[in-house]
Amino acid sequence: MWYNNSAGPFLLTGFLGSEAVHYRISMSFFVIYFSVLFGNGTLLVLIWNDHSLHEPMYYFLAMLADTDLGMTFTTMPTVLGVLLLDQREIAHAACFTQSFIHSLAIVESGILLVLAYDCFIAIRTPLRYNCILTNSRVMNIGLGVLMRGFMSILPIILSLYCYPYCGSRALLHTFCLHQDVIKLACADITFNHIYPIIQTSLTVFLDALIIIFSYILILKTVMGIASGQEEAKSLNTCVSHISCVLVFHITVMGLSFIHRFGKHAPHVVPITMSYVHFLFPPFVNPIIYSIKTKQIQRSIIRLFSGQSRA
């Protein structure tokens, strides 16, 4: 059954009962929004302009920054619209589209996996690095990661169009999440309970296992290096990536746990966890790489001091 076009739009709620402080909350979100745009935008400009950053690792970082910007662009305008302008209504199609674009979380997981592969190649077979990760191969990997994310979530989103919706039109958050929308469906939603578990297991959690295995091999290689200074230099290459992996997967597991087992948790807990999941990684990723990657630090200095690019 196709969803009822005559049914009213969904209503975004969010921080119910705290309307008096919506302005303060929105200002905090606006600062985070600006920081995400500035941080990831600056990273993209650096990689675009600085020829010394035209290497596979930085191309993958550019993909990560693009993904973080996409997540933010599709979430924050809706959030700010609810908090500042009280624009709570959202059409079914717009809601489903927003849920679809949230598949960028799976894309981000794939990019973090690819960055682990990049680190693995750089440390295990450094002399063959440029032969293995050619520009065409980097492009194909990026397209593959993007297609995997979108295609894996497509069955869930298409199923949303097939359900009738009745009863309350209120959604828990200030943006559309599949876990939230499906609760309003008046039909058998067994598929929408089982498929996300399989999907997440075969993408995000499998990616995490492969990353762990790759770092076990990386550590074995590094421990075989005679010089302690060279060990530290090799590991420092991957510290920023490990930090981003931890940030992403901790927030994913937190959000999944809350939606699966936190039915009796206070209203504000799942809402806060969803914001942490969608905003914290895009906020900290450029900071982590700027602090831990010397090439990016030098590029930032050249950019803001007006020096010629490498």
From Swiss-Prot:
Presence of the UniProt keyword Nucleotidyltransferase in the record? no
Q: Which domain of life is it from?
A: Eukaryota
Task: Name the GO terms of the biological process aspect.
Answer: sensory perception of smell
* Gene name per UniProt: OR51B4
Q: Which residues lie on this side of the membrane: Cytoplasmic?
A: 45-52, 118-136, 215-234, 292-310
Name recorded for this polypeptide = Olfactory receptor 51B4
Q: What is its main location?
A: membrane
Any GO CC annotation of this UniProt entry: plasma membrane
Q: What does this protein do?
A: Odorant receptor.
- Show the disulfide pairing: C95-C186
Q: How does it sit in the membrane?
A: Multi-pass membrane protein
Glycan attachment positions: N4
Keyword check for Membrane: yes
Q: Which residues form a coiled coil?
A: none
One MF term in GO for this entry?
G protein-coupled receptor activity
Q: Which SUPFAM superfamilies match?
A: Family A G protein-coupled receptor-like (SSF81321)
Compartment list: Cell membrane
Q: Which residues lie on this side of the membrane: Extracellular?
A: 1-23, 74-97, 158-193, 256-270
The UniProt entry's sequence similarity note says: Belongs to the G-protein coupled receptor 1 family.
Q: Which UniProt keywords apply?
A: Cell membrane, Disulfide bond, G-protein coupled receptor, Glycoprotein, Membrane, Olfaction, Receptor, Sensory transduction, Transducer, Transmembrane, Transmembrane helix
Which ranges does the record mark as transmembrane? 24-44, 53-73, 98-117, 137-157, 194-214, 235-255, 271-291
Tell me the Pfam families matching this sequence.
7tm_4
Recorded hits in PANTHER family, A to Z, give: OLFACTORY RECEPTOR 51B4, OLFACTORY RECEPTOR 56B1-RELATED
